[in-house]
Amino acid sequence: MKVDMHQAEQWPSQRLLGSRAPQSNDNELSWTSVLNSEEDPWLYDQILFGRRTFPVAGYVAIAGECMRQLSDSKLEFFSTKDLSIGSSLVFDPDDKLELHTTLRPQRLDEENRQWYEIEIASRNGGQSTALCTGLVAREVLDTQILPDLTRHGDSNWPVSPDYWYDMVADRGIEYGASQRGLNDISVDFTENKASATILPALDTTDSVAHPVFIDHCLQLSMVAACKGQGRLLADLSVVTSIQHLVVSNNAWSKLRVNSVVTPGRLQNLTCNFSAVNENGLPILSGQCNITPIPDLERQSDGKLFSFINWATDSTFHNLNQSLAPFQSDLDSTVALERLALLYALRSEDIGAQSQPYSKKILKKIGTKRKGRFGLVPDVSPFVGCGPSGRAELIKLLKAQISGTELSSLGHALERCLTENTPFSGSNRERQLLLDQLHPLIRNSGTLCESLRLLAYKNPKMNVLELGSGRKDSSNLVLKALRTQFDEQLYSSYLSASASLDATTGPKESSRTNGHVQPLVFDAEKSIEEQGLKAGSYDLIIITDVAALGSNAALGAKSLKRLIRPQGHVLLLEGVPEPEWLLVLKDYLTKESPEASTGSKTKSSFEDVSAALTKNGFVFEDPDNKLTSAPKVFARLKQPVPETSSEITVVGPTYHLPLIREVEKTFGDHNIKCVKSTMDDDIPPGRDIMVFVDFDEPYVYNITEAELSKFVKLVSGMKGKMIWVTPSAQIYCKNPNSSLILGLMRTMRSEFKKDITTVELDPKRTMNVSLSKSLLQIYEGLSRRGKSKDLDPDYEYAIVDGVIKTPRLQWTTAEAEYAHLASLRAEQDSGPQSCHMAATVRFRPDCCYLLVGGLGGLGRMISAWMVENGARHIIFFSRSAKEGPETTPFFDRLRAQGCTVTPFVGSVTNLPDVEEAIKQATAPVAGVIQMSAVMRVRIFAFDPEPLLTGIEG
C-alpha cells in the first residue's frame, strides 16, 4: 500500500504536525514541527516532578492531524490502537521542541480496513529519541471495543476541582490554567468511576481535536483510580499506552466525560473512558493503561528507618515440603485440572479423537484409564461416570471457575481442548493470558518464598544459574531475591547457558533486576576452563537438566565441586506443575501439540536426582522423615554434628517443666544434661544452656557479687553457651527480658565467646516442640557458616515451633509509624513478625458507636472505616441528625453498603447512652470517642473554652 501523496501535499503547515519533510515518499510520509512557548502556551502547562512534560494527548492529536491531511478535510473521525509511549519528552521553558512524525501504510486487515503505523520522535541536536509508536486509521470503527459508559449515568458524589488539582500538585504534577479543565467532578465510592464536564476554552479550528481536551479525558482516569480521594492516591499515575481510541471531528462544545478504572497486575490499571456533547452525540471513546510512577526523591528520603525483621531460618526448614501441591476441592487449579481431563474424555464421547491436546492427555492417562493425572489422584471416577455425567461435571466445574480470577484461563483451556485450530486471539490477549499464567508456572509463589528464605539467611549469596538462559526462569529467581524495597539479596548472579544467544535473556533481566553476568557453559569441559570457581556458590539453580550434559553422574560431580558446604542446588524442573497449565502454556506459545508439553524429561530428571544422591546430596527434611515432598532443593549431606556428650543445664532453684523436657530430648540423642544453678561451680570446659530468666530476668536485680560471678563464668568458659530467655523482640510482655540480649552482645564482643541467645514462650508453644527446636539449634552451632561478609547467627527465636533469625532491613517512615500504631494490638493478639503492619479490617457483622465524628476529621475516619469493612455505624452526638449538612455524607456511606444510624443525645447522660446502644442493628464491637477541636493552641494558658467544645 502507498500513501496518497497528492492529498498530503496540498495541506499547509499545521502547528502540531508541522510541514511535510522533503524525504517523504509513497511508502513513507513524514512531517517536522517546531513548537515553542509563545505560540503553544498550552504545551508548557503540565509539570511532572518539576519538569515540563509533553502530554500524551499531544501524540493522539498529531495522529488525528495525519489522518485529516490524508482525507481531504472530509474526516468524520479517526481511530488509534496499540499506541505505546516509549519515553517521556521533558524540556525546559526556553526549549524549542522539534518533533518528527512518520506514517507508513500497513496491509489491509481481515475486514479490508487500512491502518497506518505512526512513529513520533524528538530531535535534540543530532540525537533522536523515539517517543510514541502505534497504529492510526481514518474512519475505522470497531464497535465491539468501544465502551458504552454514558448509559450508566454520572457518578453521584461531587469532588471539588480545586481540591483535586491542589492534591495532585502536592503529589508531583502541576497543571497550568489551560490544563485545569475538569469541572463538576463526581465519583462513585463503590466502584472506580468518575464523571466530569469539560468546557472548551481554546480555539480548535487548527486541529481535529485539540490535545488539551483529549488530555482532560485522560486526566479523569486518575480521578477514577483513587475515587477522587487524595489519601487513596499513593503515587501519581500516567498513561503508558492506549489500546484503542476513537475521536470524532464534530464541533467540540460542552462535553460530559465518564471514566471507569479496573485494577490490573503489577499495579497497572486499565481505564475505559468516553465523552459526549450536549446533544448526547459521542465525541471520544477509548481504553488506556495508566501506571503509577513513584516519586523517587520522596522514596529515597523516606528510607531513613530500619527495623529488625524475623523470618524462618532456612537451615531448620524443609524447603521441599512447602512445595508440595495444594489439593483442595475448592482450589481453582484443581478444578481446572479436572476440567482438562473431562474435556479430553469428552473428545472421545463426541468422536473428536483428532483434537491434538486432548489426544495428548488421553495418551498420558493410558489405556487402563486409572491412576494419577496431575492434581487428580485417580482418573477412574471421571472415566466411569459416562458421557452424560461428564457433561454435567463440566458444567459444574465451569461454574466454579467462572467466579474466580482464573476464569479467563478457563475459557482459554476450553478452546485449547475443544477446537482444532491454533490460538486465534490478538497478541495482546495472548500476552494478558500468559501474564496471568506465569505466576502459576512452577508454583512460583511458594517457590519464591523458599528462595527468599535462603536469601534472607544469606543476603550475600553467590548464585549460579545453569540452563537454557530463558528470561522467564531468570526473572522468577531474580524477583524472589529482592526485598520489598527492591534491594538485592545476593552478592553475584552468574547465568550460564549452552549457547551465546541464550545469554541475551539474562542481560535484559539485569537492567531491571540486578547485575547478572552471562556465561556460555559447556558440560563437557572442566569448570576451571570456563572461569567457574570450585566451592564458591551458595545457590546453584538448574533451570534445564540438559545443561548438565548427557552424563548425569559427571554433572553431579561438577555440582559437588562448585557448591559450598552449606549451599543448595535447586532443580527447577522438579517443581510440580498441573497438567492443564502445561497444556495451556503450549497452546498460547504456539508450540506443537505433538511436542513436549513442558513436563520434565522423566529419565533425564530422575537420572540427575539419582546422581546427586549418589554424590552426597540429600533432598529429605532435617528430621530424615520420608515425605511426599518433591525433589527440588538438594544440599550436601551434613556431617554428624560435633556435640559434647554432656551439657550443663543451668536452671532456677524451683522446678521448670521445660528443663525436664530438654533433659529427655537431649538424652534421646545421647547428650546427658547435668543440672546446675548459678550458685554452683560450673565446669568451664562444658557447653552450657541457661534457663534462669523465666521467673524474673536474671540481670534485672543482679547484685554486685552475682555480677562478678557471672562475668567470671562467661570469661572463663571454653565451650558454647545458649542463654534461653522469654520473648523480648518479636513480642514482649516484660521488657526487662531484653536486658540479657544487650549484655550478651557486649560480652560476645568483648570476650570473643560463642554465646547464643534463644527467645521463646513456654505458654504459647508446647515444651516438647521447644526442646526439639533447642536441640536443632544446639546441634547446628558447630555448622554455622562464617565469611568476611556475613557473621554467624547468635540470636534465635522459637515461635510456634518455628526457628527464626533476625535481619536488619530498611523501611519507610510511613511503614514505621503504622507498625508503632499496631504494637498495642499485637501484644494482645500474640506473636507477630516485626514487619509492615497488616491492613486494618473492621468487622462487617458488628456495629461501631462513634461519639461525635461529624466534623472534618471524624468524617474522614468514618469513611476510612467503611472502606475497610465497617457496615454498621451509629453517630451519637447532639448534632447527629438528618439534615442538609449531614444527609449527603450519610448517603455516601450508605452507597458503600453501610447502615448509618444517627442518634441525637449527650454522652454525659447515661439514659442517652443506653438508648443509643439500643439502636444498634448488630452487636457493638467498638465505641470510639471522636470529639475533637482542630485548633493549635497552648493549653497551659486558657484551656476552658476548648474543653467545653470537646465535651459537647
From Swiss-Prot:
Region feature (C-terminal hotdog fold): 156-302
Enumerate the GO terms in the molecular function aspect. fatty acid synthase activity; methyltransferase activity; oxidoreductase activity
Q: Where is this region: N-terminal hotdog fold?
A: 14-143
The Enzyme Commission number assigned here is 2.3.1.-
Region annotated Disordered, chain positions? 1-25
The way this protein is applied in practice is: Terrein shows anticancer activity on various tumors including cervical carcinoma, ovarian cancer, and head and neck cancer. The secondary metabolite acts as angiogenesis inhibitors through the inhibition of angiogenin secretion. Terrein also has anti-inflammatory activity. It shows an alleviative function of age-related inflammation characterized as an anti-oxidant and might therefore be a useful nutraceutical compound for anti-aging. Terrein may enhance osseointegration by decreasing the level of ROS and has a potentially synergistic effect on osteoblast differentiation.
One GO term under biological process is: secondary metabolite biosynthetic process
Region of interest: Ketoreductase (KR) domain:
847-938
- Function of this protein? 6-hydroxymellein synthase; part of the gene cluster that mediates the biosynthesis of terrein, a fungal metabolite with ecological, antimicrobial, antiproliferative, and antioxidative activities. The first step in the pathway is performed by the polyketide synthase terA that produces 4-hydroxy-6-methylpyranon (4-HMP), orsellinic acid (OA), and 2,3-dehydro-6-hydroxymellein (2,3-dehydro-6-HM) by condensing acetyl-CoA with two, three, or four malonyl-CoA units, respectively. 4-HMP and OA are not pathway intermediates, but are rather shunt or side products.
By its UniProt entry, which PANTHER family does this protein fall under?
FATTY ACID SYNTHASE, SYNTHASE, PUTATIVE (JCVI)-RELATED
Task: Name it.
Answer: 6-hydroxymellein synthase terB
Name the gene behind this protein. Answer: terB
